[in-house]
């Protein structure tokens, strides 16, 4: 899996947590999130810890650092522009209320729409493809179709090429 895919998956995971339990301080929440990701990866490599065992985290790997560098601006941007992004979702999600949508799908959409609207260095078709794959991985097979349908409508409204970087 590429670093950018991994970063997007982590971004969706953080946005999901943020959506369901907004932290008082986003910076602290991000630091805790990245530490928990590293702890989970270490436990996967090392095996389960015993009670009372203290685990000292090694420095982040180059791949972990690259994922964080790519993901954090996406996370912060999606949070900063959430109201506008949610309006796009409401406009195109016919017969769906935002709060009734699966939380995973809602946050996959938020991330992808942020990329499509504000990240001209990422072609919209890349954002759509990544969002569909992440929705299928973390939600349901039907989520991929749902996410694709909404994002395709938004792509049609963009004032930039779908396959090119500006």
Predicted regions and their residues:
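N-terminal interaction/assembly modules
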Residues: 1-166
């Amino acid at each position: 899996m590429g670093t950018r895919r991994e970063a997007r998956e982590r971004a969706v995971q953080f946005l999901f947590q943020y959506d369901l339990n907004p932290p008082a301080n986003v910076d602290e929440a991000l630091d805790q999130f990245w530490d928990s990701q590293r702890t989970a990866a270490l436990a996967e490599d090392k095996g389960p810890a015993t009670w009372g065992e203290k685990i000292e985290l090694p420095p982040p790997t180059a791949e972990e650092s690259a994922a964080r560098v790519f993901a954090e601006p996406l996370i912060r941007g999606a949070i900063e522009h959430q109201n506008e992004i949610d309006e796009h979702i409401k406009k195109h999600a016919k017969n769906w209320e935002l709060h009734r949508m699966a939380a995973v799908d809602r946050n996959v959409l938020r991330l992808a729409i942020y990329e499509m609207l504000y990240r001209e260095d990422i072609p919209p078709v890349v954002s759509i493809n990544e969002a569909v794959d992440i929705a299928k991985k973390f939600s349901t097979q039907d989520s991929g179709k749902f996410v694709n349908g909404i994002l395709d409508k938004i792509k049609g409204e963009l004032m930039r090429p779908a396959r090119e970087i500006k």
